[in-house]
Amino acid sequence: MANLCTKSDYKAYKKIEHAKDDSQIDVLVTSISELVKTYCGSTLIDYYSSNKTETFDIFDAGTAEVFLTESPLVSVSSVQERDSITDSYTTLTANTDYYVDTEHDRIFRIDGDISSKAWSRGFASVQIVYRAGYSTTPQDLRLAIYDLITYYLKEEYKGRKSMAGATLQNETSTSIREDIGFPDHIKRVLDMYRVVDVM
């Protein structure tokens, strides 16, 4: 999976001209990219130009919509459904059998053009192939990622550091409820890209 920024992007932003921290920055770029993707619940850029196949288990007889994991939705290649795990998938027709809601990244099962219909029930009863995300990491998110790299590179997560007889006290608490440890200004940006599971 692709990193959300590169070492050279970070070094240019921070105006770093030396190479002494390059190996640590390389590790942080990869680790923080994965951390941000995990926290946001989306890969953000990985499926913008390549297909993602997602299957859904439907257990409720009244379920007429499914929410896709990746966001924002770019395109839908195919929507398929099956009645049981032993059956083959049947390909559905757009705007006749299903409707794509790009604003909310969801697919509705429909019956014609005026009413909804429940999806078939069962394990992996719905399979959708689609593309979603961003062509490049959005600039505001990129800024938060740079700040996270600095946060870990300079070990700002440590409450207290001693160096050459001086003590540096970092404020590790946050004013945000249910804090997970990110500084407030970074968490606010990450939360704008967070996909919340509605299931």
Model segments located where?
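Divalent metal-cofactor coordination and adjacent catalytic microenvironments
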Residues: 1-199
